Amino acid sequence: MLHTRTSAAPDTRAREYFEKTIALLNEHGTTPVIVIMPIHPRVLRVMKEHDMGGERQQLRDYLAALEQTASIKVLDFTTIRSFGGEADWFYDGVHITRRNTNRVITAVKAKAGEYLK
């Protein structure tokens, strides 16, 4: 049985440091590329069945809002379809093998290559 829990409140201090880091990078002409890493399809299915994953959606919403005020590029590779990955290429629910890692790197280059210097 899965236990339910409420989402933790965002750490405002961590956000402050994160946003200051992005501002510093932007001041130096750099656009950070932020990659939301994949979750195994089976785990995503269970999360959906049990109405879990709110933190990830909060992260997406936060980064989408931040894109409006800062120069960042966000790539959401939560699903394996988003980067051409394979379900068999996970060590567990969230850790990808070298083969999926290579696919993620290829997708990052294709979708955000102009920011990689």
List the model feature ranges, each with a label.
Residues 54, 60-117:
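C-terminal regions of proteins
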Residues 1-74:
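Conserved, well-ordered alpha-helix/loop/beta-strand core segments that scaffold catalytic motifs
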